[in-house]
Each structure stands twice: as structure tokens, then as C-alpha cells.
């Protein structure tokens, strides 16, 4: 932050910390680690502590964050309470959910219990009204735009590679398969980044969500595959499929979806994951190269594993799988960051 803006931010925070939270000592702002966006977070030494956020309005959609927060909270989805907001400058005062992310708590003994709770949040989210004035639609254009990041940032920029016109044609065909798969399944509220680093484990033992300002109306399997095929932690396929089908049963029991056979649901789920992970290869590359966040490179090998695994399983993505393994994978493993995982 510039010195002037920093002072303005500090003054705003001092002014708007609610009376009930004020400690006798002078308020201090302690910087916290950021996320993949441009927001900066600070813990305030109030009683109890609060989180101050500087979220540049030219980079982040703060209106969306607030309207989605209020909509989710109205359906008992746990997100941070908002105590004050300045839309013009992008300043916010939020409830402090603590420091415990779900990711470090996950192991083979704990995962089923935690994921059951996380999946319950996804079930609650399906009860949220799909209001297009709050949640944009995850339409064909959005899905295709995301997939285009793979070529631009992963293939061209990170691997310094160019595609032949036949490769471009093949990708267009595969993207069509993935987009149709996303649009043909039942739609509901989608967090869009529902994974172990965006779920907080609170002192109350509740799970709460963060980083949901990009939520949309989209495919019913999107958040499920983001959770079960997390880009930062992997589980055996047997467990992933068992949990996915258990979730399908819960959706059907609540009548959020009509009865669908297991094979069709897993195809929705797998190909939705393939769309997400092809996109993520582009996004992680962009975060590293454009936004100076090189740590994301060491998460690429797992995402590549997911891409190869699923594309090999389905006849209509096999051509992509063969091309990726022959053309892209050798260039990827020759990168110096590959051994970091």
C-alpha cells in the first residue's frame, strides 16, 4: 500500500471498529498471509479480534463479496460476518474466523469426518435461491474462457511451446465435450474454489467458508470435485468415488437432483474435474508468471496427474490424453520446478 492509502486505511479501521470490540490499548493491524487474489488481510487486536481487509475495488469484486456473504448467511452457510465496508476504497471489517485452515488437519483418519461436514455445507448451498442478480451464471462463454488459459499461460508462457493447428482443433473438440458435460448436469450454487485452503475450522468446531466472492450458478458436481480432487492434497480414487456417490445419494434424498445412475454421475464428476484442472494449469501458471507467486508451480504436478488420470478413462477424451502424454508431459517434467513436489 502507498503510505497515504495505508494511513487512510488505518484511520478508517480505527473509526469503524465497533464500540463493543474496542480494547483499552491502541489498535494495531497485524499483516496476514494473502491468497491468490489482490486482497490484503490484517488481524486487529480488538476484543475479540477482527480482520481488516484492503481489497482494491479495481481488482476485486467487493459488491459481489458482500451480496453473496449475506445470501449464504441467510441459508445458514457459515461465512464471516461483515461489520463495516467502504466500497469506494475497498476497505472491510470482517469477523475473525481464526487461523486454522482445514488442509493441515486432513489425514486418512480425519478426512471422512471433515469431508462429511464440508459436503453438508454443499448440500446447504443447494438450498440457496439461484438468484441471478446475486450469482452470475457459469455459462458456456465462462467455461470456454477458463479453458483458454491452459493454452495461453501453461502451454505458451510456462512451457514456451506453440500448438499446431491440428492440436488447436483437437483442443476445441475436447473443450466442447467438457463444456457440454458441465451444462447438461443439474445446476446450483457453486463456490468455485471449494477446497481445503478455503475452509476454516473454527474453535466452535464448525467449518466456515472464505474466498467465495466468485460464486456462480453452475454444475452440481463442480464444488464436489474441487473438494475431493483438491489441487493441494490427493486421496485414493476408491475413496473419492465412494464419497462422490455418497454425496449423490444425499442430493437425491433432498430432491436437489432427480435419480441418476452412478456411472452417469461419476462421468459428470470426472469430466467436471478435468475442465477445472485444465483451467487450473493455466491459472497456477499465470499466478506464478504474471502475479509473482511462484509457490503455485510446485502444486502443478498433482494437477497434471489429475488431468492425465481422467482423460485416460473416457473414450471421448482419450485423444487429448495421448496428445498430452506425448507432447506436453515431457516438456513439463523437464521444468526445473517439477522435482519440488
What does each model-found stretch correspond to?
Residues 1-91, 188, 202-207, 324-341:
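Conserved NTP-binding catalytic cores of kinases and kinase-like/nucleotidyltransferase enzymes
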Residues 8-21, 130-136, 142, 146-190, ...:
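An alpha-helical support segment within catalytic cores of ATP-dependent transferases
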Residues 31, 38-44, 52, 125, ...:
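Active-site acidic catalytic loop and adjacent metal/ATP-binding pocket
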Residues 33, 37-149, 155-160, 167, ...:
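ATP-binding pocket architecture of kinase catalytic cores
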Residues 65, 111, 115-118, 143, ...:
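Hydrophobic packing residues in well-ordered alpha-helices of helical domains and bundles
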Residues 142, 191, 216-220, 266-274:
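Secondary-structure capping and boundary motifs in well-ordered enzyme cores
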Residues 149-158, 220-257, 271-291, 303-311:
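Active-site activation/catalytic loop segments of kinase-like enzymes and analogous catalytic loops
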Residues 282-341:
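ATP/Mg2+ or Mg2+-diphosphate-binding catalytic cores
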Amino acid at each position: 500500500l502507498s503510505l497515504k492509502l495505508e494511513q487512510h486505511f488505518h484511520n478508517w479501521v480505527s473509526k469503524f471498529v465497533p464500540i463493543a470490540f474496542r480494547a483499552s490499548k491502541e489498535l494495531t493491524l497485524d499483516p496476514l498471509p494473502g491468497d491468490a487474489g489482490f486482497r490484503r488481510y490484517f488481524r486487529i487486536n480488538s476484543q475479540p479480534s477482527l480482520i481488516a481487509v484492503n481489497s482494491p475495488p479495481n481488482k476485486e469484486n467487493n459488491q459481489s463479496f458482500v451480496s453473496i456473504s449475506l445470501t449464504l448467511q441467510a441459508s445458514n452457510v457459515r461465512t464471516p460476518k461483515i461489520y463495516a465496508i467502504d466500497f469506494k476504497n475497498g476497505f472491510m471489517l470482517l469477523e475473525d474466523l481464526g487461523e486454522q485452515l482445514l488442509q493441515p488437519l486432513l489425514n486418512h483418519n480425519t478426512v471422512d469426518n471433515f469431508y462429511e461436514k464440508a459436503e453438508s455445507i454443499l448440500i446447504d448451498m443447494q438450498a440457496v435461491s439461484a438468484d441471478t442478480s446475486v450469482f452470475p451464471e457459469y455459462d458456456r462463454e465462462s467455461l470456454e474462457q477458463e479453458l483458454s488459459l491452459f493454452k495461453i499461460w501453461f502451454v505458451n508462457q510456462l512451457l514456451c511451446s506453440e500448438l499446431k493447428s491440428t492440436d488447436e482443433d483437437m483442443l476445441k473438440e475436447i473443450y466442447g465435450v467438457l463444456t457440454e458435460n458441465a451444462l447438461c448436469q443439474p445446476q446450483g450454487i457453486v463456490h468455485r474454489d471449494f477446497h481445503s485452503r478455503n475452509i476454516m475450522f473454527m474453535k466452535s468446531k464448525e467449518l466456515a467458508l472464505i474466498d467465495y466472492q466468485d460464486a456462480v450458478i453452475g454444475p452440481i458436481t463442480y464444488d464436489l470435485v474441487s473438494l475431493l480432487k483438491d489441487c493441494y492434497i490427493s486421496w485414493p480414487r476408491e475413496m473419492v468415488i465412494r464419497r462422490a456417490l455418497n454425496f449423490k445419494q444425499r442430493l437425491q434424498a433432498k430432491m436437489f437432483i432427480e435419480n441418476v445412475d452412478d456411472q452417469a454421475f461419476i462421468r459428470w464428476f470426472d469430466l467436471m474435474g478435468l475442465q477445472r484442472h485444465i483451467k487450473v494449469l493455466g491459472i497456477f501458471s499465470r499466478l506464478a508468471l504474471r502475479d509473482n507467486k511462484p509457490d503455485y508451480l510446485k502444486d502443478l504436478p498433482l494437477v497434471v496427474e489429475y488431468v492425465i488420470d481422467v482423460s485416460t478413462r473416457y473414450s471421448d477424451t482419450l485423444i487429448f490424453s495421448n496428445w498430452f502424454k506425448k507432447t506436453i508431459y515431457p516438456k513439463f517434467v523437464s521444468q526445473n520446478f517439477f522435482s519440488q513436489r
